[in-house]
Curated annotation (Swiss-Prot):
Function: Binds voltage-independently at site-4 of sodium channels (Nav) and shift the voltage of activation toward more negative potentials thereby affecting sodium channel activation and promoting spontaneous and repetitive firing.
One Pfam family named in its UniProt record: Toxin_3
Organism (species): Lychas mucronatus (Chinese swimming scorpion)
SMART domains, sorted: Knot1
Subcellular location: Secreted
GO BP terms: defense response
Protein name in UniProt: Neurotoxin LmNaTx11.1
Amino acid sequence: MKIVIIFFIAMMAVGVYSKDGYLVKKNGCKYDCTPLFGDSNCNGECKAFKASWGSCYWFACYCRGLPDSVPTYPSSKTCSS
């Protein structure tokens, strides 16, 4: 029985950092990148927001393992330059 309880607690902890998506700025626009050179930049940007890693995908930074509080695309805000 203790194992079942520990399993559920562990699953809840993992779920906190399980959000994936395109990182957006405060103005609602995605973080831009260049596919051949942008992976290291995107990885740094995503990790700054507590993601597990990030990469450049379709000319925008895609993050894995973001906290639920970090806004991702599509954002409720529209992109305004």
